[in-house]
């Protein structure tokens, strides 16, 4: 958890964190509507957050819980009152929706929109630096939300990746208004608070601050999205403050001129020289058009092939692309001009290091937890760490011996690893195709692009594999029930880089996948999935009934975890070493496979996957 600076109340806050709320399994609002408690989502400040299901309509919500014992102090009551007063009046597509506020004898509750894809902080941990196109996609949404706040004379004052949540469509939602305040025109606030890596110099210098502190934070956010770490970050907080006061940071040379100029304007040490949120949205960075470096291919696919391949994966719920706002449409239009380009991706040389790191992490867990395996665990509710749940995992797969393995990820994107070590993947909307050749060079295409003739055969194979999965395999839908969402929004384009299967094999007990983002997934024959993420240092278990439990490795070391999971972690330790690449290793390896691939003379071979491996 990031360090939060406050000159007053630090000790009180530390004490507040000891007040873990006693939350009953069923709570009732002031209209006696029942809510059923679900997973623990996280904590911050003096509140804990849980998922709840509203039983009268089955809606799933996030519920922030504050123990009343904390509110005995007037400062805490005033802070909570201000937070509720500000948040409940907000209604915007890029702000977490506030629904309701009520209390019982022990706690105060407020119900919020549930953001199922964690936050940009988790995305940053998994992905590191994003492409400029992706950074534009997220930053423009942050600026839209900030513009709405500033129009209402509200300063957020704690904008950071951890407070920028993502819904199932990767739509950014600004949350946590614990430090927010109203601010009149020409008024200056003197409170010294915020998060060190995002705090503006005028706050540190105590010269008075206003709306410009949020603009500064947008600059820090854009910098982190583009380059992976905050601009003023250092090992010591005080050194970070010195760098902020001196405006001591460097924009990497690989930044585009428009990105460089925008960052420098957002991080201007003089507040009055920073752009307004409205001006940020009009910046050239969000309108930049990069000419395609790959010339169009004149040989065009037949229209029938285009429609068949790029049709929505789920025919029951056809995807409808609608602009959210004019500024979103401009970014979407810019996408097509940049999309046809070759990108040399990082080679797989780091895969062995990632697997070695994961093996070491698991070994450390098993060596230190083995003594506690037999003790009963009764406190797993708060030990769950849903914020460490990976964004992607394999939900379906099928193997055709003559061609390769096709698969679908949990958010409905799909891909295929061909026998010649090339890859093909398509996003969940079915309108963006990526081909990765044997040299690990990526080629991007959209629905309107002319695809080279030499890819037509693989596109046809990939299309047939998708059709097979649609027809024959059980759908592994999102763990959240999207049809029960309160506020439907048009799906946004998914710009997160989709991982691919880099290596896989079968045993008599399971199927093991290694993804390009470092994740290792094991699908057991009893329909339990285990997803190990070395970057988030966590393990996620997905039961046959779709129940999800995520534990950080640190959490397991401290509190152990259910005995039924430890044996699976031991199994993973034994099998991960078989995934480590050797000099001549191909992508696909088979170990003790009960259904070893055989030569087939049919058009696509007999699939070796079956529903027993699927959730």
Swiss-Prot record:
<dbReference type="InterPro" id="IPR033695">
    <property type="entry name" value="POLO_box_2"/>
</dbReference>
<dbReference type="GO" id="GO:0005634">
    <property type="term" value="C:nucleus"/>
</dbReference>
<dbReference type="GO" id="GO:0106310">
    <property type="term" value="F:protein serine kinase activity"/>
</dbReference>
<dbReference type="GO" id="GO:0004674">
    <property type="term" value="F:protein serine/threonine kinase activity"/>
</dbReference>
<dbReference type="Pfam" id="PF00069">
    <property type="entry name" value="Pkinase"/>
</dbReference>
<dbReference type="GO" id="GO:0005737">
    <property type="term" value="C:cytoplasm"/>
</dbReference>
<dbReference type="InterPro" id="IPR011009">
    <property type="entry name" value="Kinase-like_dom_sf"/>
</dbReference>
<feature type="domain" description="Protein kinase">
    <location>
        <begin position="35"/>
        <end position="286"/>
    </location>
</feature>
<keyword id="KW-0418">Kinase</keyword>
<dbReference type="InterPro" id="IPR017441">
    <property type="entry name" value="Protein_kinase_ATP_BS"/>
</dbReference>
<feature type="region of interest" description="Disordered">
    <location>
        <begin position="1"/>
        <end position="20"/>
    </location>
</feature>
<keyword id="KW-0723">Serine/threonine-protein kinase</keyword>
<keyword id="KW-0547">Nucleotide-binding</keyword>
<dbReference type="InterPro" id="IPR033701">
    <property type="entry name" value="POLO_box_1"/>
</dbReference>
<dbReference type="GO" id="GO:0000776">
    <property type="term" value="C:kinetochore"/>
</dbReference>
<feature type="domain" description="POLO box 1">
    <location>
        <begin position="393"/>
        <end position="471"/>
    </location>
</feature>
<dbReference type="GO" id="GO:0005524">
    <property type="term" value="F:ATP binding"/>
</dbReference>
<keyword id="KW-0539">Nucleus</keyword>
<dbReference type="InterPro" id="IPR036947">
    <property type="entry name" value="POLO_box_dom_sf"/>
</dbReference>
<dbReference type="InterPro" id="IPR000959">
    <property type="entry name" value="POLO_box_dom"/>
</dbReference>
<dbReference type="Pfam" id="PF00659">
    <property type="entry name" value="POLO_box"/>
</dbReference>
<dbReference type="InterPro" id="IPR008271">
    <property type="entry name" value="Ser/Thr_kinase_AS"/>
</dbReference>
<keyword id="KW-0677">Repeat</keyword>
<dbReference type="GO" id="GO:0005813">
    <property type="term" value="C:centrosome"/>
</dbReference>
<dbReference type="GO" id="GO:0007052">
    <property type="term" value="P:mitotic spindle organization"/>
</dbReference>
<dbReference type="GO" id="GO:0000922">
    <property type="term" value="C:spindle pole"/>
</dbReference>
<protein>
    <recommendedName>
        <fullName>Serine/threonine-protein kinase plk-3</fullName>
        <ecNumber>2.7.11.21</ecNumber>
    </recommendedName>
</protein>
<feature type="binding site">
    <location>
        <begin position="41"/>
        <end position="49"/>
    </location>
    <ligand>
        <name>ATP</name>
    </ligand>
</feature>
<feature type="active site" description="Proton acceptor">
    <location>
        <position position="158"/>
    </location>
</feature>
<keyword id="KW-0808">Transferase</keyword>
<comment type="function">
    <text>May be required for cell division and may have a role during G1 or S phase.</text>
</comment>
<keyword id="KW-0067">ATP-binding</keyword>
<feature type="domain" description="POLO box 2">
    <location>
        <begin position="500"/>
        <end position="581"/>
    </location>
</feature>
<comment type="similarity">
    <text>Belongs to the protein kinase superfamily. Ser/Thr protein kinase family. CDC5/Polo subfamily.</text>
</comment>
<dbReference type="InterPro" id="IPR000719">
    <property type="entry name" value="Prot_kinase_dom"/>
</dbReference>
<feature type="binding site">
    <location>
        <position position="64"/>
    </location>
    <ligand>
        <name>ATP</name>
    </ligand>
</feature>
């Amino acid at each position: 958890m990031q360090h939060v600076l406050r000159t007053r109340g630090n000790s009180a806050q530390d004490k507040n964190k000891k007040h873990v709320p006693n939350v009953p399994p069923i709570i009732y609002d002031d209209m006696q509507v029942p809510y059923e408690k679900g997973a623990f989502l996280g904590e911050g400040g003096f509140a804990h957050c849980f998922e709840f299901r509203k039983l009268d309509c089955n809606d799933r919500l996030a519920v922030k819980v504050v123990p009343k014992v904390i509110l005995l102090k007037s400062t805490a009551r005033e802070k909570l009152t201000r937070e509720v007063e500000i948040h409940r009046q907000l209604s915007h597509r890029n702000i977490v929706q506030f629904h309701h506020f009520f209390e019982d004898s022990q706690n105060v509750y407020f119900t919020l929109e549930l953001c199922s894809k964690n936050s940009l902080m988790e995305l940053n941990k998994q992905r590191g630096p994003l492409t400029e196109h992706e950074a534009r996609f997220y930053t423009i949404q942050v600026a839209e939300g900030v513009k709405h706040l500033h129009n209402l004379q509200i300063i957020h004052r704690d904008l950071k990746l951890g407070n920028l949540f993502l819904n199932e469509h990767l739509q950014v939602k600004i949350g946590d208004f614990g430090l927010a305040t109203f601010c009149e025109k020409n008024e200056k606030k003197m409170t010294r608070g915020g998060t060190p890596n995002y705090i503006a110099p005028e706050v540190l210098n105590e010269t008075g601050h206003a709306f410009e502190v949020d603009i500064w934070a947008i600059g820090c956010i854009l910098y982190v999205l583009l380059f992976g770490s905050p601009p003023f970050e250092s090992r010591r907080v005080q050194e970070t403050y010195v760098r902020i006061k001196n405006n001591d940071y460097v924009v990497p040379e690989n930044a585009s001129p428009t990105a460089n100029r925008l960052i420098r304007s957002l991080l201007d040490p003089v507040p009055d020289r920073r752009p307004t949120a409205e001006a940020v949205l009009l910046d050239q960075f969000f309108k930049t058009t990069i000419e395609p470096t790959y010339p169009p291919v004149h040989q065009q696919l037949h229209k029938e092939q285009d429609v068949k391949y790029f049709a929505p994966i789920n025919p029951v719920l056809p995807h409808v692309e609608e602009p959210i706002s004019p500024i979103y449409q401009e970014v979407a239009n810019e996408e097509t001009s940049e999309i046809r380009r070759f990108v040399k991706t990082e080679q797989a040389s780091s895969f062995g290091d990632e697997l070695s790191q994961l093996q070491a992490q698991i070994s450390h867990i098993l060596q230190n937890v083995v003594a506690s395996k037999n003790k009963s665990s009764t406190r797993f509710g708060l030990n769950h760490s849903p914020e460490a749940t990976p964004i992607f995992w394999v939900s379906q797969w099928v193997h055709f011996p003559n061609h390769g393995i096709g698969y679908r990820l949990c958010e409905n994107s799909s891909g295929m690893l061909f026998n010649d070590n090339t890859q093909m993947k398509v996003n969940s909307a079915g309108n963006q195709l990526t081909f990765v050749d044997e040299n690990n060079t990526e080629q991007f295409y959209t629905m309107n692009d002319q695809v080279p003739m030499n890819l037509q055969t693989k596109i046809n194979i990939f299309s047939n594999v998708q059709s097979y999965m649609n027809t024959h395999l059980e759908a592994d839908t999102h763990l959240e029930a999207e049809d029960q969402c309160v506020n439907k929004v048009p799906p946004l384009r998914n710009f997160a880089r989709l991982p691919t299967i880099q290596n896989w094999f079968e045993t008599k007990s399971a199927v093991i996948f290694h993804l390009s983002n470092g994740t290792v997934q094991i699908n057991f024959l009893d329909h339990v999935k285990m997803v190990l993420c070395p970057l988030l240092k966590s393990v996620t278990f997905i039961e046959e009934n779709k129940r999800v439990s995520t534990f950080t490795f640190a959490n397991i070391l401290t509190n152990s975890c259910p005995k039924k999971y430890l044996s699976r972690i031991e199994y993973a330790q034994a099998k991960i070493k078989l995934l480590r690449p050797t000099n001549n290793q191909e992508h696909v390896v088979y170990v003790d496979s009960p259904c070893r691939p055989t030569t087939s003379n049919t058009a696509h071979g007999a699939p070796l996957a079956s529903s027993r491996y699927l959730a």
